[in-house]
């Protein structure tokens, strides 16, 4: 492809680092810029030959400098829930001023119709993108399998995996799958502006099936216990999670019970030209890291 200049915002996060790894397989480091907040991440990326910009979504002046001269950018959604819509608008405005030719945004699976509370700020951001006039692509990412894998140590300790997803099927995928998709969209020779991708795993599962796979791999019996949303939230708070985060997780599980995290389009596997990472792999990785 031609020597486009790329920018990845939020590059020091778990998804961002994987996107950079994917881009480096396709284009040279000299064409890639990153937006990071910390000195350590800035030094790490500079050592890899990338163009480093320090700043964040809450400081528009830093965004203007980062987007200058960029052809294609990935706006990774902020982790600051409740402030994301404003922060994302700052980034969109900077991209508009810079004349960015494609701004890809990591949204949420079926964001326009999703019952998840998490979808609200994604809908606001999508609306801002559409109103901005900036050519955009929506990467509506489903759930990360790693989100559930993070609960494995507690599940093994207590012999039970709690949730409120009922029999809802969850078409999650590994972060690396979504990262590869983002890298493919950013570097595609085909027209991407105006595209909306509903991205999810190939093999949906229930949390009971997750618990069964965990039991199989660990050799310990782990049962799935379904709770009402309020009780699950209370259990998470009791385990030490901040109340807002506990509420978000419980709401997401309740949404999963309604089908909000399921999808059968196969778009993610098609986009990355391979099957998405099977459920067994992140569970195995989590077990290996806990030993």
Please provide the spans of the model-predicted regions:
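A hydrophobic C-terminal alpha-helical subdomain
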Residues: 230-291
